Amino acid sequence: MHIIEESYLQTFSHSLTPHITTLRTALETAYINGATASSLAYRPQFVSNNHKEGKKVLSSVEDELLACDQFQISVAFITMSGITPLLQTLKELEKKNIPGEILTTNYLNFSEPRALKKLNELQNITLKMYDVEAAKEGFHTKGYIFKKEEIYRIIIGSSNITSAALTYNREWNTKIVSTEDGEMAREIVQEFDSLWNSKYALDFDTFYESYREKYKIIKHQRDVAKLDDITSIEKYKLEPNSMQVGFIKNLRKIQEAGERKALLISATGTGKTYASAFAMRELGFQRVLFLVHRNQIAKQAKKSFRKVFSGQVSMGLVTGKYQEYDKDFIFATIQTLSKEENLHRYEKNTFDAIVIDEAHHSAANSYKKVLDYFEPKLWLGMTATPDKRDDNLEGRNIYEIFNHQIAYEIRLQDAMEEDLLCPFHYFGITDLDIIADAGKSSEEKVENFRYLTSEERVENVMKQAEYFGYSGDRVKGLIFCSRIDEAKELSKKFNAKGWRTLVLSGSDSEEARAAAIERLAGEESEDALDYIISVDIFSEGVDVPEINQVIMLRPTESPIVFIQQLGRGLRKAENKEYVVVLDFIGNYRNNFMIPIALSGDRSYNKDNIRRYVTEGGRVIPGASTIHFDEISRKRIFQAIDNANFSDIKLIRENYRNLKNKLGHIPALADFDKYGEMDVLRIFDNNSLGSYYKFLVKYEKEYTIRLSEDEEKVIEFISKKLASGKRIHELELLKRTLQYHHGIIGRLQKHLSEKYHCEMDEHCTENVINMMTNEFSTSAAKKTYAQCVFLKKEQDDYGISDVYGKMLENPEFCAILEELVDFGISRYKVNYSYHYQDTNLVLYQKYTYEDACRLLNWERNEVPLNIGGYKYDKKTKTFPIFINYDKQDNISDTTKYEDHFVAENRLIAISKSGRSMDSEDVQNFLNATKRGIDVQLFVRKNKDDKISKEFYYLGRVIATGNAKQFVMPNTDKTAVEIEWELETPVREDIYQYIVNE
């Protein structure tokens, strides 16, 4: 099919004029003056891969596909790893019937037939192959042409449709934007049409079978060539990776310091077992005991050690089935070894080193028995989940067992950065409307079971699994369910429809499990398995590197369990480029845990979590990708909105994890240092208000007690100042710990010398009001009546009598100083890069109260009095606060809503009852002339009851385009004003705000 009509002789129509004006400005930004504000959508751009900056060629291609009316692609190479992350987007285009033409080539016979077949199966796509052998010419094009109405956007450069090219390789591409009459776009489209209509461009049915056969022969030859040097391949495999090298180095230091215990915390699939084997070899241990909790894991560990030691030491198994006690290296199950008769076969000091695999089990009694008996030179614990335990007893934790000596810690995100794991393509897919069983009646559970195992659900799972596919010659998948009866019924129905599945549970024998895994991991045969279905036994420990598809059919219990189950597919293996993860997302209240698990962000900041759902694919390291379909995305947003991240249970759990890791009560700075929950969640909790109050209520070891007034002062600083959004008050408090008089003068001098920051009269007045409880609204003034830090002294201020009395208490001073230092640290990291001459930082988030304070208002204003904006005459500042919550029918209602036109253009509506002559409207329109400073604050979700924060987007200037109108369904007028942002909104923030 030919989808793009020639229109080269057309003249510009009147409808094109707005596009032309916008395009001209964008071209000026790109080619003449980068400081010119223009629309990113019309701007030529350099397109490359850099996940740390939120940039991937893949994201650019996806964005254009989702926005276009039609597309054409010409690339030399297409692989499954390249099209898999695009499959969800391509499916959406098929539903919308967006036509596409894709031209590839048989150049070097590199394109994968399976990928070509997958593309051709999409009803909206026509695929052709350019035969370079017949044409007797090379073919190395890499171009992506997207058309929307009269505008072309074309990405052209170095990127084929392969995983490496689209996600992490150093790639150089240019995105050009042109009208359909532009010379460059016209030439590119003509070139594509010429190739597409050439006699050498073969239809799919013409080329596919012969190309597939030829590809198969050549691939076999390549595979044989790879096997020519087996020795060098094995040697390469046995070189320690970056994690293992770092771990051995640190372990040596721990030993040299005289410590006898150490813990390795490492993400599933990063090679913990090999790390321990390399460590035993490098540190020269002669007798080693390797403890596991399953026979199968003991066998796998022995196999890994055998590769590292190559027969230099004898190795044996001590399990229910094997009794090979007298070997140098023993691989034993805890169940067998902890029996008295087996334990006492060995002397206490028989082993130089004892390694405990899945060490989060070591708090159990069976392990305690072994830990109490043996006296090796080194105890080494290994786990991916140190915070997961077999008991809930206070004080019995893994960190404590290993003396809080962490030899190395590498979590999922770190492991992906280091390329230690197999890339994954995660797809969040809408499941049926199933409600979790927890708290349901038996009748409701029966009804739920019918849904879980319904024909509709079975067919949907099979359809999605087939569409999204796998890497390799055949599927080798794991399916996680929430119930054993569900697993059995699903297996029965899957098998009836042609899948080969088997259910494994805790009741199955080791032999049955081993046999099932062999059938799954092996090559195609009569008794091969496509999937093993499980509830929990594959969450940890079992190593099946060949797994190339993971299907999750259960609610996310916790980020820990999610990562464990995801991790089953993340081990690297021969002929496995990536693993496909299909997560069927129902209406579960814990859905918010999915982005927390994938991002590794444990701050529990709602807006950060929302942004990861929409933008995570841009920032995830390496070739991995993340996609959610529209409904599953909404379900996660709903779960985030409903969650209370300042809930005391969540706070206590995160606190306990950090305390366990450290072995003592954490300092405030430890929460940031170890990436635990943002301590501001503690301050936000209304029953707490401060870390001090939390410790008093929930930490038995904490014995400090302050007076009620002292406690209130600590709460005030925690809630109002400790976030570090401004340095002034924090450094003022720091001065009061040293000086009692001349506080403001000393503060001004210190800020000028250390921060190059000057305090004008408005700022000085605001800081004084803040520290004398005069800034607060009446309700807050009453709550914090004791929080008066300063008193007037001639031409300066000294500390107040009440506060001075508090400073006589050394315990109060210590808590105050820690809190102030924490706030200063936060300021330096997050809030020190001010926008122009303000106290604000672009793209940081601020509440109404923050804005009033940082704009140096004399008094705070309650949000109700501010509404969408408020003018402060004294400072001549005029902040605008916008709740950006786009509706589904946006095209019909934009003229009555605040909305972005481009990254540097905003349409905002005045308050109702306003006309062109209203004072606030005139102040907006004449702001520059009147010396009024208009600042823009925008928030995505006004229903977030916890943060209530707005992104700060800088200064705005009214363009002069304004019109008065009557608001729908009322007799009141309002004024629509167009604003220009001095700084166009950063791409990732803009996309997050404007997209649903």
Model region roles, listed by residue range:
Residues 1-241, 245:
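PLD/PLD-like phosphodiesterase catalytic module centered on the HKD motif
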Residues 214-240, 466-467, 471-472, 597-730, ...:
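Long, largely alpha-helical accessory region at the distal end of helicase-like NTP-driven motors
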Residues 361-425:
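Post-DEXD/H (motif II) to motif III coupling segment of the RecA-like Helicase ATP-binding lobe
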Residues 713-717, 726-732, 839-949:
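Acidic, glycine-rich low-complexity segments with interspersed aromatic residues
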